[in-house]
UniProtKB/Swiss-Prot annotation:
Extracellular face of the membrane: 19-494
Tissue: Expressed predominantly in sensory neurons. Expressed asymmetrically in the right ASE (ASER) neuron and bilaterally in ASI and URX neurons. Expressed in PVT and bilaterally in AIY non-sensory neurons. Expressed in intestine.
Species this protein is from: Caenorhabditis elegans
Compositionally biased region (Low complexity): 1105-1117
Keywords: cGMP biosynthesis, Chemotaxis, Coiled coil, Glycoprotein, GTP-binding, Lyase, Membrane, Nucleotide-binding, Receptor, Signal, Transmembrane, Transmembrane helix
Topology Cytoplasmic: residue spans: 516-1137
Protein name, as recorded: Receptor-type guanylate cyclase gcy-1
UniProt biased composition (Polar residues): 1088-1098
Domain Protein kinase: 557-826
Gene: gcy-1
Sites where a glycan is attached: 219, 348, 358, 384, 417, 451
Length: 1137
């Protein structure tokens, strides 16, 4: 009633208290004195909040602040009033602090009710209040009601939610609440808040079976309470204010036999001491907090209860604010000097309590008083001013309270509502009786539900080490009085047990019989399975009619006829490079290979059983193994097209990109399947073990045979497919990794892409051993096959993938699964099946074959005509026909022919004035037009050598005596043409000919097989050559025989004259003649010049060329000398200048 009267007066007449308040604004000065008003208590709860054992914390805190660099610009003055938590005294002291002493800050009374009153008073005068002691009531955290109050003690409501979380963590929901009586009613308030949190609908339901108050010196009441607790609960939450009461509780629960494995005593505290007490008697301390264990006596000696209290402490846990102090040495210093500090200046406490205080004990809340003063000093320093208008402004100052620091009560964090954000921890004792934190309950952002962190992994060993490593139950199995134990299983189910035993025995007998049957069946099944993979040697028949396909014709894709399944229907199959043998088994052709006889283990046999079950389109099916002969013989399905090595070695087939892609994809799919099976890898992959069936589908063979030794020593060439890490380590298949298969796959892919053997070994300068050595050697740039393909549309990504697969480091190679995944995007989605692709190719080939044949036939006919024309230009037609027919051309004699020789006069001089190209072009122009003139006459051009020109008439087609006329006419045309012929690069030079003609017998024939030539033999030819060499420029020189033929058979047609007798080399003296032209075509002056010549009469007969003659088939053109020599040039190759 007293407090309400005081508050009413304070609210009605506030002017009484503030009317004489002077202006606080003063001139700034160098150092400012801070006045601290302290409402202390000496006679209540002396060991906890007594000023004699706590007051020294204030000057020690100021001293520590200055050591840490704070409050250097301030001095402090203390005004202490012992209010003893009396409400009237609190109001009086508050008014004196504010009105009389004009304090800057008030350290409030250490009791919750008194602190509320002081806070109301200070709020009206804008003074900050620091709370400590028993001030954990929840309403004191209301920043709206108490905006200027701050404390380092968390409120008990937070403790309640932490306790609720703890019970949930250990699955307890039935508890007892016990608390010691005190005048300040601290524990009573705490338990009220605990009860409120347990009843909060947002928390798990907790059944409070008893809530009782116990007394330190009232053993009768306490005994009754403990007896009631024993009959109702095993999980006890209890609260006390002093260390004496803590030790008293331990001794009492030990006396009442409440320290068994069923009991859990959890002390609720917010004093940051856990299992410790604040004393300086020199007794052992905890390593974490630096405090003395509560089971130690409070005297320098012992009182005989230490062992009992220590044993009881093993059944106790403490839920307290984190008590770990960072600076334990200063805490020890504080414990030793706190009494001295309160007695010495500036406190100068001279009361009886201060002067007689026990120097070995520090007050329970002394550390909290230290921390709250330390907090004020930090906030004061952070105002960065000694101006009272600044630090005296409480609204500015309270914002600086929101901070954190390492204090004597652990890590202090002040929230925006000016209360401490606690870290509650559940403490227990380890095997060394040292307190350890077991569970952490952390509050963040003012949320009332803490976060739980467990500091242990094994709950039984860490938390319940003193409980037999088993968590106690909140309700004992036998009840609280031990009378509700369940009936033993034997007594309750004795009859049922006998019946069950009989049934079990009967079932065991049935099971034994069943097991025997199962074992027998499994043995029979195992024998049957073994019989499946064991192929009797007697059933393997070598086919006498087996025919290799070496002599058989093969199509472009190496197709071969199918193999009949009967004994009588044996046909050809492809060759095998490996030592395979084709045999008959169960009326089917199979592929076999021999191995040396070895001992087969149980694991080998089980593997063969599993191998028979392997089924994949790219795996060659394993039929079995013959083990009843001198050798082991493996039997697999026959692939009629042989192996990839066989196909590539023959090399007489075409393969486009999609065909290559499908072959490589089949190998990759086979590997992917094997790598996922029990075999794990192939281990012997090479192109010889990749077999191809009729459908051009690749199937991997020789897998799972690594424990068998081949009958013949394998060639070193097989090492070309082996990965470098296998070569270096000489690894067996069981030691290899699947990446070794990937390397072998890359070598096979390179064979397919290049359509050559591995490493192109046939065209490579290194032999197998050198290649294997270099691969084994490795290095920064290891040797690898070259991928050079003649297929233009090969996807570069496929080549890149192959190169990735033969990477030197096994880990860098892709897996078979990755290879298959990447290959899906390397070909058009419309193309998926190789046989469909082959059929499409055949259809396209069939549709275009007829057109191609017709076109080729036309081309062949045209080329044949061209060849015939060319051949007819080289040889006479009839001679060429006989040569084309494969007939021998016999030499043939002719009685009368005329031979023509010509030569360019002074050709050497002309050639010296020309470059070689110009010389060739000169002769080409001249002789091309000569050839045109020849075509108009019955003359055959034999050859032209340099500037020499040889022609003949009268062979190979006989023309009577017309040959002399043809030669003379042609010679006159030659002379006429030379008069109009101009040399482009020598316009002043003229071309003149010397012509020699002779008639007589001759022999002609084809000489030679390489570049055959139609040659003339006989003296007639030599004499004609002498006529040319002894002739004169621009004149036609005839022998007497030729002249006689001309004048006899063609009289009066040609104007000739005798040259007289001339000495001819090899002939002696000969009379020769000149031909000047034809009558009627010569100028009159020319006729007068030769009128005195004697000329035989001639006739007007003319020779008509035979259209069936050899030269008659050549293309001809009409020669007109008036048109110039350009008209007669042929379309022949002309060498450029």
């Amino acid at each position: 009633m007293q407090i309400f009267t005081i508050l009413l007066l304070f609210n009605i007449f506030p002017s009484i208290f503030v009317q004489n308040l002077p202006d606080t604004t003063v001139a700034p000065r160098t150092k400012r004195t801070i006045k601290i008003g302290i409402a202390a208590a000496q006679r209540i709860q002396t060991s906890s909040i007594g000023w004699s054992v706590c007051g020294g914390a204030v000057p020690l805190a100021i001293e520590r602040l200055k050591e840490m660099g704070f409050v250097k610009d301030f001095d402090f003055e203390y005004i202490v009033d012992y209010t003893e938590c009396d409400l009237g005294s609190v109001v009086r002291a508050g008014m004196e602090f504010i009105k009389t002493h004009k304090v800057d800050v008030i350290i409030g009374p250490p009791c919750a009710q008194a602190l509320r009153l002081m806070s109301f008073l200070a709020e009206n005068y804008k003074k900050p209040v620091l709370g400590w002691g028993f001030v954990s009531d929840t309403d004191l955290s209301d920043v709206i009601r108490f905006p200027h109050l701050t404390t380092v003690i968390p409120n008990s409501l937070m403790l309640g939610y932490a306790a609720s979380k703890m019970l949930t963590t250990f699955h307890w929901n039935r508890v007892a609440l016990l608390y010691y009586f005190s005048d300040v009613k601290y524990c009573s308030g705490v338990m009220n808040d605990i009860e409120a949190t347990f009843n909060d609908p947002s928390t798990p339901n907790v059944n409070i079976v008893i809530k009782a108050e116990i007394y330190l010196n009232d053993n009768e009441t306490t005994d009754n309470v403990f007896q009631t607790v024993k009959s109702r609960a095993r999980i006890i939450l209890w609260c006390t204010q002093t260390s004496v009461e803590k030790r008293d509780y331990l001794i009492k629960i030990a006396t009442h036999d409440m320290i068994g494995d069923e009991y859990v005593h959890i002390m609720l505290s917010m004093r940051n001491v856990a299992f410790g007490t604040q004393t300086s008697l020199g007794k052992p301390t905890f390593s974490q907090s630096g405090l003395t264990p509560i089971w130690e006596s409070f005297t320098e000696g012992t009182d005989g209860f230490e062992k009992m209290a220590k044993q009881a402490a093993t059944r106790m846990f403490v839920l307290d604010v984190n008590s770990e102090v960072a600076d334990k040495k200063y805490l020890e210093y504080m414990q030793k000097n706190i009494i001295k500090a309160v007695q010495s200046p500036p406190m100068n406490c001279s009361t009886v309590e201060c002067m007689t205080a026990n120097t070995t004990i520090m007050g329970g809340y002394a550390r909290h008083l230290f921390d709250v003063v330390y907090l004020y000093g930090i906030a004061l320093t952070h105002t960065n001013s000694t101006d009272p208008a600044v630090y005296g402004d409480v609204d500015v100052l309270v914002h600086q309270f929101v901070t954190s620091f390492q204090g004597m009560t652990g890590h202090v964090v002040i929230s925006p509502n000016l209360t401490r954000m606690p870290i509650f921890q559940l403490y227990g004792l380890n095997s060394d009786y040292d307190q350890v934190a077991l569970v952490d309950f952390t509050y963040t952002n003012s949320v009332m539900v803490p976060n739980v962190t467990l500091f242990y992994k094994d709950e039984g060993g860490a938390v319940w080490s003193y409980y037999g490593h088993s968590r106690p139950l909140d309700i004992p199995i036998c009840g609280f009085l031990g009378k509700s134990c369940p009936v033993s299983f034997w007594e309750q189910y004795k009859i049922l047990i006998f019946v069950a035993i009989a049934v079990i025995v009967l079932m065991v007998l049935i099971m034994i019989i069943g097991c025997l049957c199962v074992i027998s069946g499994k043995r029979a099944e195992r024998a049957r399975i073994n019989a499946e993979w064991q192929v009797p040697f007697a059933k393997l028949i070598e086919s006498e009619k087996q025919v290799r396909g070496k002599g058989a014709s093969r199509r472009s894709l190496q197709s071969a006829p199918s193999i009949s399944t009967g004994h009588s229907g044996v046909t050809t199959v492809s060759d095998f490079c490996e030592n395979y043998t084709m045999m008959m088994y169960e009326k089917e052709m199979v592929l076999t290979a021999k191995y040396q006889y070895t001992h087969l283990t149980k694991a080998d046999k089980e593997r063969f059983v599993k191998m028979r079950k392997l089924d994949h389109e790219n795996i060659n099916r394993f039929i079995g193994l013959s083990i009843d002969s001198a050798h082991f013989i493996s039997v697999t399905k026959l692939c009629s097209r042989g192996s990839l090595q066989d196909i590539l070695s023959r090399g007489n087939f075409s393969m486009d990109y999609f065909f290559m892609f499908c072959i490589i994809r089949d190998v990759a799919k086979g590997l992917e399947y094997l790598h996922k099976t029990f075999l794990r890898l192939h281990g012997n992959l090479r192109s010889a073990t990749c077999l191809v069936n009729d459908s051009w589908q690749v199937k991997l063979a020789e897998y799972g045979m690594d424990n068998l030794v081949e009958e013949q020593t394998p060639p070193k060439k097989r090492l070309l497919w082996v990965a470098p890490e296998v070569l270096r380590g000489s690894l067996s298949v069981s030691q290899m990794e699947p990446s070794a298969d990937i390397y072998s796959f890359a070598i096979i892919a390179s064979e397919i892409l290049t359509k050559k053997e591995a490493w192109d070994i046939l065209d490579r300068k290194e032999d197998c051993e050198e290649i294997v050595y270099n691969v084994k050697k490795g290095g920064l740039f290891p040797i690898r096959p070259e991928i050079i393909t003649d297929i233009h549309d090969v996807n570069p990504a496929l080549i890149a993938l192959v190169k990735d697969c033969w990477a030197e480091v096994p880990e860098d190679r892709p897996t078979a699964e990755n290879i298959c995944s990447q290959m899906k995007g390397l070909v058009s989605k419309q193309k998926t099946n190789l046989m469909d692709h082959v059929f499409n190719m055949l259809e396209e080939y069939t549709s275009t074959l007829e057109e191609e044949i017709e076109e080729r036939t036309k081309e062949l006919t045209l080329e044949k005509k061209k060849a015939d024309i060319l051949l007819s230009r080289m040889l006479p037609k009839q001679v060429a026909e006989r040569l084309k027919a494969g007939q021998t051309v016999e030499p043939e004699g002719f009685d009368s022919v005329t031979v023509f020789f010509s030569d360019v006069v002074k050709f050497t001089i002309l050639a010296s004035k020309c470059s070689p190209f110009q010389t060739v072009n000169l002769l080409n122009d001249l002789y091309s037009n000569f050839d045109t003139i020849i075509e108009q006459h019955g003359v055959y051009k034999v050859e032209s050598i340099g500037d020499g020109y040889l022609c003949v008439s009268g062979l190979p087609t006989r023309n009577g005596y017309a040959h002399i006329k043809q030669i003379v006419d042609m010679s006159l045309k030659f002379m006429e043409y030379c008069k109009s012929f101009n040399i482009p690069h020598l316009p002043r030079e003229n071309v003149e000919l010397r012509i020699g003609v002779n008639s007589g017998p001759c022999v002609a024939g084809v000489v030679g097989l390489s570049m055959p030539r139609y040659c003339l033999f006989g003296d007639t030819v030599n004499t004609a050559s002498r006529m040319e060499s002894n002739g004169k420029p621009s004149l036609i020189h005839l022998t007497n025989d030729a002249h006689s033929l001309l004048t006899t058979h063609y009289p009066n047609q040609y104007e000739t004259s005798s040259r007289g007798e001339v000495i001819i080399k090899g002939k002696g003296v000969m009379e020769t003649f000149w031909v000047h032209g034809r009558f009627g075509e010569m100028e009159p002056t020319e006729l007068r010049s030769i009128s005195n010549r004697s000329t035989p009469p001639v006739t007007n007969d003319r020779w008509i060329p035979n259209p069936s003659s050899s030269h008659g088939s050549r293309p001809s053109s009409v020669y007109d000398p008036l048109q110039g020599h350009q008209k007669f040039k042929m379309d022949t190759l002309k060498v450029a200048n």
